[in-house]
Structure formats: C-alpha cells, structure tokens
C-alpha cells in the first residue's frame, strides 16, 4: 500500500519534459573542470545558427520532479546544471530547482535570457547566454533581465566573428557587467567552413 501511495504521488506531481540526464565534466563557466550532473530539458523557442543541441528541440519524455532528483542522486557529484534547449520555458523548472537546492546541491541553470530570470530561486547560479548578432537570435533577450543580474550569476557570449566580439564588448561595458556578475565569458565558436 505504501508503494502504491508513493507511485500515486509521483503521478500527480509536476512533470517536466526531459531530453537527457547525464554525468560529465563541466566545460563552461567558472565551474569548468568539475564533475557535474546535467539535466537537459526539452524545447527551445530559439534557433541559433551554431546550436549543438538541436536534438533537444523535440526529443524528450515527461518525468516527475522526484524521479529526476532520484536519478541525479545516483551520479557522483553535488554540482547540477539545468540546461536545454531553454529550460525556463517549462513552468515546473522552478519546482525542480527548489527540489535540488533543498537537497543540498549546488545548482546552475543555463538560460538564453529570453524569459524572466528574476523568477529563479535566489540560491541558484544563473549562467545567462546573451545571444550575439551572428547567432540569429540577438533580439530574443528580455531587456529587463539586465537589471536582475547579480554577483551569483555569470554571463556568456558565444562569439562567431569580429562583429560579435565588438558587440559583446560594448554590451559588457554599457551594461556594466564587470563587477556586477561573477564572471563574463567570451566563448568563440567556429563559423561554418568558408565563412571565416
């Protein structure tokens, strides 16, 4: 009976569309080099030219928050990154954040800033990937998110060319990001062959 009750609770609790959960070494941000559990959520409204996770646009299964936390607990790390796609498009992502934080995990969320980041739990580390002009999604950033950036956050610009670099540098200066956030990252990406 107790097992049936637990299963009923799992069925009625909030669910998220999960693309994958995996263990790897953190490759970006100031946590680079550390073991990390990644929870990749399904879906993204953007179509950045350099996207390397387009499989997350449509592939994924609905899972309860409890089952996600249970799977993460089997991985040998206390660092978790919620990513996508764009994780903030799923309303129950906040329930997942809180569940992981309440279990004592250090939680990162990588977001494009296309949605309101102020709704995130204040204990979380937000990695805000501000889209540059060459991404094809530069107009997607919610301008009010600049006002909500804090020292717990990091900002990332994926740089495809010199114009992107200049734009990111100007944005860093005009938004006074240095000193307002934990770190600002300029991450170069190779352009398509023949366009360098």
Show which residues each predicted segment covers.
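Short linear functional motifs in flexible/disordered or boundary regions
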Residues: 30, 51, 60-63, 80, ...
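N-terminal amphipathic/basic-hydrophobic helices that include classical n-h-c signal peptides
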Residues: 1-10
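Generic structural signal for well-ordered alpha-helical scaffold segments
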Residues: 26, 69-73, 173
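Conserved Radical SAM active-site core
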Residues: 16-20, 35-38, 42, 46-125
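Short, charged low-complexity linear segments at domain edges
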Residues: 11-35
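Short amphipathic alpha-helical segments, especially helix-boundary/capping motifs
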Residues: 12-13, 44-46, 71-74, 143-147, ...
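Conserved AdoMet/S-adenosylmethionine-binding subsite of the radical SAM
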Residues: 88-196
